[in-house]
A protein has these predicted regions:
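Glycine-rich, acidic/polar active-site loops that bind/position phosphate-bearing ligands
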Residues: 1-212
Length: 212
C-alpha cells in the first residue's frame, strides 16, 4: 500500500491556495504509453490527495474488464506543478497519479506501478537507475501536414530562425515546470530539433517525458 507524506500534501494545498489554482489535472499513463487524465476542482484536492479519485477503469484500453471497473487515481504530491501556459487567474496545475484498486493496493496494469516495482527490485540488488534522454522532435508549419519550418542541419546556428525561437520557448517552459535542461540544438534533418534533459531517477524522468 502506498503512503503519502503529510508534509508534502500540506505543501500542495498551500501552493494551490497561494497561486489561485482552480483546476488540477490528474495524469496517468496507460499500459500502451498514452497520457490519460481528468481534471478536478481545487475543492476536491485534499480528498484526492488523501484518498484518491475514483474512475471507470474499464474505459481505459488495456486496463480491466467492465466487471472490475472501479479504480482510483491517487495523486503524487511530489509531482505538483502549475502549468505555465495556462492563465494565472483560476490557474491549472497537474499531478501524476498512481492507480489503485478499491482495496488500496497498486493496480497491476499501472505503468508507474510496474516501473516502481522494477526499480525496487533493482534497489535490492544495489542498483540505482538514472535516465538522461535526448528528446528529438520536428516542428511543422501546421498540424495537418509535414511541411518543415526550417531547412537547417546538424548544429546549425541561425538566431533569426522561427524554429530556434520555438525551441528556446520550449526550454523555458520546461524550466518553468521544474524540469532541468542541459542543452538544445538543431538536429540533422530539416526542422528536427533536440532537447537534452538532465539525468535524474527513472520514475521522475518517466513523469518528465510524459509531460514533455
Amino acid at each position: 500500500m502506498l503512503t503519502r507524506d503529510p508534509d508534502a500534501i500540506e505543501f500542495v494545498l498551500h501552493e494551490a491556495r497561494e497561486n489561485d489554482v482552480k483546476f488540477i489535472r490528474l495524469w496517468f499513463t496507460d499500459i500502451l504509453g498514452n497520457l490519460k487524465g481528468f481534471a478536478i476542482t481545487v475543492e476536491e484536492l485534499e480528498g484526492a490527495l488523501r484518498g484518491g479519485m475514483g474512475f471507470d477503469g474499464s474505459s481505459i484500453e488495456g486496463f480491466i474488464r467492465s466487471d472490475e471497473r472501479d479504480l482510483y487515481a491517487l495523486p503524487d504530491p511530489n509531482t505538483f506543478n502549475i502549468l505555465p501556459w495556462r492563465p494565472r487567474t483560476n490557474a491549472v496545475a497537474r499531478m501524476f497519479c498512481d492507480i489503485m484498486t478499491p482495496d488500496g493496493e497498486p493496480f497491476g496494469g499501472d505503468s508507474r506501478a510496474v516501473l516502481r516495482r522494477n526499480l525496487d527490485r533493482a534497489s535490492k540488488l544495489g542498483y540505482t537507475y538514472y535516465v538522461g534522454p535526448e528528446m528529438e522532435y520536428f516542428y511543422f508549419e501546421d498540424s495537418s501536414g509535414t511541411k518543415p519550418l526550417d531547412h537547417g542541419s546538424y548544429f546549425d546556428q541561425d538566431a533569426t530562425d522561427i524554429s530556434t525561437d520555438l525551441r528556446r520557448q520550449s526550454v523555458l517552459t520546461l524550466e518553468d515546470l521544474g524540469i532541468p535542461v542541459e542543452a538544445s540544438h538543431h538536429e540533422v534533418a530539416p526542422s528536427q530539433h533536440e532537447i537534452d534533459l538532465r539525468h535524474t531517477d527513472a520514475l521522475t524522468m518517466a513523469d518528465t517525458v510524459m509531460t514533455y
